[in-house]
Design a protein with these regions (language model features):
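C-terminal output helix
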Residues: 107-116
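Acidic catalytic/metal-coordinating carboxylates
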Residues: 5, 36, 62-65, 83
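Short hydrophobic/Thr-rich beta-strand motif most characteristic of the beta2 strand and flanking loop
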Residues: 28-35, 43
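Short amphipathic alpha-helix used as the core "switch/output" element in two-component signaling
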Residues: 42, 64-76
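CheY-like receiver
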Residues: 122-149
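The feature encodes the CheY-like receiver
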Residues: 17, 59, 83
Length: 149
């Protein structure tokens, strides 16, 4: 399920980006990096990602703003907010703005990997549910069209 899953890591700290990339690539994920919100938006316009790890504070925009832009542009991408400024209010705001998960820096490697796997599983379940609903709709329409008046 998560073999070849694509992950976008968005963080202005190069060390954090590269560390997350190394950890995720060791697990078999395909990882792309962005240092700014604008760069992240550009990348999501060119490629589809399963997961986006979004820093809550970026040099050109707040992570919450990026979260909204990505939600509108890539609704199927699972968005995980990552922050070095943990507070209950920022967590609530992120989750209310449709973040799928929330991690606090310094990110525990095990917690990162578990969260990514959980989000990929949820993404797969949503995909299967959508396919099932489409199949049910088609089946119903075929029956309706096949039934004489």
């Amino acid at each position: 399920m998560d073999r070849n899953a694509k992950v976008l890591v968005v963080d202005d700290d190069e060390n954090i980006r590269n560390t997350m990339k190394a950890i995720l690539e060791d697990e078999g994920y395909i990882v792309d990096l962005a240092a700014t919100g604008r760069e992240a938006v550009e990348k999501t316009q060119k490629a589809a990602y399963n997961i986006a790890l979004l820093d809550i504070r970026l040099p050109d925009m707040e992570g919450i703003e990026l979260l909204k832009l990505m939600k509108d542009a890539t609704p199927r991408t699972r968005k995980i907010m990552v922050t070095g400024y943990p507070s209950m209010q920022s967590a609530i705001t992120a989750l209310n703005k449709n973040a799928d998960a929330y991690l606090v820096k310094p990110v525990n490697i095990e917690k990162l990997l578990i969260t990514v796997k959980e989000q990929l599983q949820l993404q797969e379940e949503e995909r299967q549910f959508s396919e099932q609903k489409v199949a049910e709709f088609i089946e119903t329409r075929v029956k309706e069209l096949s039934t004489p008046f």
